[in-house]
Amino acid sequence: MNVRRALLSMMSVLCLAAGACGGAEDVARPSSRGAIVSVAPVFEMTGPETSDYLAEWKYPVAAANGVRAHRVVYETVAADGTPTTASGLVLVPDTATERLRLVSYAHGTTVRRDEAPSADGETERARTVQFAAAGYAAVAPDYLGLGEGPGAHPYAHAPTEASASADLLLAARALLADQHRELDPGVLVTGFSQGAQAALALARELRGGTVPGFGLAASAAVSGAYAVREVQAPAALDGRVEGRRAVLYLGYWITAMNRIYHVYDDPAEAFQPPYAQRIEGLFDGYHDLLAVTSGLPNSPQKLLTPEFLALAANPTGAALRAMDDSDTVCDWASDVPVRLYAARGDRSVPFENSQRCMKAELGGTAELVDLGDIDHGDTVRTALPQILDWFRKTQPPA
């Protein structure tokens, strides 16, 4: 980052500290969802710099705009409804347009909190930058417990993915207002993997009119586990999901859901030794993917106890509630365009998840785009440029 951008960043910090980002008078104010707690500059790029950056990440955008990025910490709610905070990335295109269309991009599975989009998550950051480079305002929620958010991350918990994403929209609107710009109320929503579930959860809230001042303009979700009980959990057990990926998914999901639904009293009820003694520590948000996977076995049958293998296949009680609470992201009807992108070659999130979504209420108006015989990571690289092109044709940035 050059000296000019560094000086601009320092000036932004000083201005924000004295203004909307909070002084002493803010400490005692009542909690308000979407209210800004703090703002910090992350980077600023000119048009040519943005173009070079996206070319390096293989998300090229023709005639890319300059982009300014902010890390926003804002007020939201925890899984039990109590006040908490979360962070997210807000990107503003360097254009003369005062009224901007907004894109919300929800990121994929992240085990380390500092790999969230507003922190050091360069891969997910680049995916968000492409929308701002095209002239949209863009946001990327970190979700609860990642980035600057306190506590542990409630992995794949659709209700809090939706609330954290929705409240970031409110924070972004306030930030843009301070810059004398406004957001069009129609939001374009997209996301990948875990973020596909989050995207549809947010889209449902926008369609239902529960996000003040915002509605849904279009949604495009890529390779999401929309049906944990009927598809994703069984596939993790029967080999459709590759072994280590299945272990990562089940270990992350079970430990996260235990904090909300209390699916076990002791890790030894769910996990075999020696993994029962270490698994909660591995998913503490401070271990990277290599550390997590190297500390766990290569198959669910080696990870889970017989009781929890049976529970994953035929859930009851708290496990069933945990699945059902997040398996509703396709149970709504849309009157705006919705696309689901998925691949038959995906060994992390089977294609059947999207097929199941198409059989739900959303399927009556959604379109399923088959990306072919490619694996999970390739789906987002293939789909996102298509999604940007679709957004630009149907809902131009300004």
How would you describe each model-predicted region?
Residues 222-331:
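Accessory cap/linker subdomain of secreted extracellular hydrolases
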Residues 334, 339-346:
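Short beta-strand/loop motif that positions the catalytic acidic residue
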Residues 78-87, 91-135, 148:
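Short, surface-exposed "cap/lid" segments of acyl-processing enzymes
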Residues 92-99, 171-190, 211:
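Gly/Ser-rich "nucleophile elbow"/oxyanion-hole loop immediately N-terminal to the catalytic nucleophile
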Residues 5, 22-98:
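Catalytic-loop region of hydrolases
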